[in-house]
């Protein structure tokens, strides 16, 4: 399926209602920079998954900008 990586792409996916699942690293959750995106995603019915940056999946997500979204459909 389609995936969005990084803050801007994830934000766009949420804005379009295309995000089915938003995945965020725990460090990005703590810094608060994505709080509005997370709130909007939950309000629009998307699942929000937090990955620990202490483990490999979270480390890989950090390498991709700390956020990603699995999409219901392709955008842009």
Summary of predicted features, one role per range:
Residues 1-76:
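Terminal alpha-helical anchor/extension segments at protein ends
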């Amino acid at each position: 399926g389609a995936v969005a990586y990084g803050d801007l792409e994830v934000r766009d996916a949420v804005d379009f209602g295309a995000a089915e699942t938003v995945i965020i690293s725990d460090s990005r959750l703590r810094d608060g920079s994505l709080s509005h995106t997370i709130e909007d995603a939950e309000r629009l019915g998307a699942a929000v998954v937090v990955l620990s940056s202490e483990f490999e999946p979270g480390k890989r997500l950090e390498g991709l900008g700390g956020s990603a979204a699995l999409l219901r459909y392709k955008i842009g």
